[in-house]
Amino acid sequence: MNRDSIPWSGTTSVGSAGEVVIRGPGEYPLADQRVELEVFMGSSIAKEELENNLFTTYVEQKLGIHFKFMTASANTADETEKLLFASGDYPPVILNGNLTPDEQVRYGQRGMLRPLNGLIDRYGDRIKEIFRQKPDLQKALTASDGNIYALPSINECLHCWYAQKLWINTSWLNKLDLDMPKTTDELYRVLLAFKQGDPNGNGLQDEIPLSGAMNAWHTEITGFLMSAFIYNTDTNYFYMDNGVVGMSAEQPQWRDGLAYIHKLFSEGLIDPAVFTQSLDGLIEKAIRKDNVLGSLTIGHIRMAFDSLNGNMQQEYETVPPLVGPAGYRAAGYFSSSESAPFAITDKATDTEAAVAIRLADFLFTEEATVRNEWGPEDKWWRTGRSGEIDEHGLPAKYWLNPDFATSLTQNDLWGQMGLLYRDRNLRESWAVTDDPHSVSGYEHRLYQETLKNYVNKEPSEVYPDYIFMDGEAAEEAGRLRAPINDYIRTNMVQFIMGVKDTKTDWDDYVDGLRELKLGRYLEIHQKAYNAFK
């Protein structure tokens, strides 16, 4: 059906916004006439494909709306969004953006974002149901002024919460008669054996014992390795000590971790390109037919293997968090998204705002979530059948076609763009296979690897990923954050590569960190944490 041919039936007026009558909860179309919504979408597909996308058409026809898309590529979406707000040329609705808590407060208090509280109370039945189920979520989304300015996409993903993983080539371990490393010393010996023992059997010393990449999902080696010395998520570098916010990167344990990683690097056990290569560079090494990669830090192993080389990933298993020389170990824990994709701006009319919040409410339903991620029923997925069991051994609610993972064209879904509500009940209700290394068994494999090695190994207290500050504090923290984090990352690489020495240059490094007003930065975050708690 043409996306402009929207069927209409019946009206039940529960109130009006302008001249358009907005229907009650659960009634579709949403209004007594079609409403056009101009929305910003950071999109992994072209605008033309998005307009003709089957899920787009499904939402438009179901809700009686017409999308007018303002798009940016996934790589430029963050920058584009910031430029739109800076210029004032933003649309009425941000549907797939990346609004951080600081930006939500800044734009909200400047009047650029509409508070959503009243709209949710009036039109957001599904949102209110979710808030009742998860009161901590509503608390986390509420800014210090009491307003909710944006909504996140909810994806309760166990392996994502513990995505800071090291994957190791177990066929190499078996060939060299090595055990899975559990300590930093054991990892050193394993990597040394990978370098010297010719585990790929080609007679050349071409093995790369450990690699990673920059600017991809948990591919930086320092996140996993440093957490054998002090907590490090490679994001804000905070650790918690009895309610006190501290900076890992100024502690003696950080220095010890840098010295350890430098040892690995100086002995050729770490890929020399690890601080410069992109994910594409890591993939090129992972899929080489002569099998040169011993281990890699990456959120999930299929990120490194394309569909043509998917069988190679079967050789890799996760390494548990390593125990360091002082007996410390920690799994990185990422409890939630650090940003929110959905907001309504001051450019929206009352009609558009009412329709937009009902759009958000619908996208949070299971019906919309399943179709958003997996497309129409009976193509890529169907309901479960007798004998199919889920992650917990219960009758499966859904079954996913194994061909979904290798399909190159999927213009019948949004693939998690926009809003969705994929809680653990939904994620873990899909049928699992007996073979965790098969395409259809991959989600089950990630679940089991995470459960085996990482769950409950995080510190008892971690700094929240999603936290609000008041307007002035958010502005100040934003100004301090970039130079502090850039300084930490630059010096981290210099210490690891041997440009700086942890014995002779450490004190100067710490002094430089404090000159960037680290004390004030921690003070701001401490105040925000106290308010959050």
Predicted regions and their residues:
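Extracytoplasmic/periplasmic substrate-binding proteins
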Residues: 105-106, 215-237, 262-426
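Generic, well-ordered alpha-helical scaffold segments in large soluble proteins
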Residues: 58, 62, 80, 84, ...
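Short beta-strand segments
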Residues: 39-41, 212, 297
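Loop/turn elements at helix/coil->beta-strand transitions in domains of secreted/extracellular proteins
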Residues: 34-37, 63-66, 88-93, 112-114, ...
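Short alpha-helical segments and helix-capping/turn motifs at coil-helix boundaries
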Residues: 21-25, 76-83, 99-102, 134-137, ...
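Conserved N-terminal structural module of periplasmic/extracytoplasmic solute-binding proteins
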Residues: 1-186, 236, 245-247, 351, ...
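Conserved small-residue motifs centered on glycine
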Residues: 8-10, 15-24, 42, 366-490, ...
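Helix-loop-helix "hinge/cap" segment bordering the ligand-binding cleft or interdomain interface
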Residues: 117, 144-220, 237-288, 342-378, ...
